[in-house]
């Protein structure tokens, strides 16, 4: 019988094992969480996303962004996983990680100052009027890969579909819905 266990045989000849001492806990390095620091950093990262949203709202020309607040801003880790988001329009966030992952996968040579835009529903977009802008962030000038990403997704009134508003009810192909941006390099610094 293993240490910490006791074995006994019942009247019906069943073998019963009982733990008599608690199991030794092994913890991996860095897995202990300080709840206070977790909350501090959670609020810090959420505040960054909220400030991104304020900048977007204050500089936007679109009524959908400026007044309807139909946008979302978030931070993502180096693999495209969501770190924090502001409480703007939650529906945008469900697939935004996939947009980030598309940019990461298709741009191994991205550089500081690059900004990408996409709205492709096949690569993490929701629908064509929701345009996502992705910016890789480098913490050091000599970093080869981004440390994390920031992204914003905003709804635009018209993206050039066959009907005003870019959401034709009788479209049979995505081409009828408007312009599709898929991993387009918008800015190279």
What spans do the regions from the language model cover?
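Conserved SET/PR-domain catalytic core that frames the SAM/AdoMet-binding pocket
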Residues: 2-7, 79
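Mobile "lid/hinge" segments at catalytic clefts and subdomain interfaces of large enzymes
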Residues: 145-189
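Long, charge-dense accessory insertions within large macromolecular proteins
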Residues: 20-24, 30-92, 97-100
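Regulatory sensory and allosteric helical modules in signal-transduction proteins
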Residues: 81-85, 97, 101-120
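A short, polar/charged loop-to-alpha-helix boundary motif
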Residues: 90-103, 157-166
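A short, hydrophobic, proline-anchored segment that marks a local hinge/packing element in signaling
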Residues: 132-141, 151
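Terminal amphipathic helices with adjacent charged low-complexity linkers/tails
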Residues: 7-28
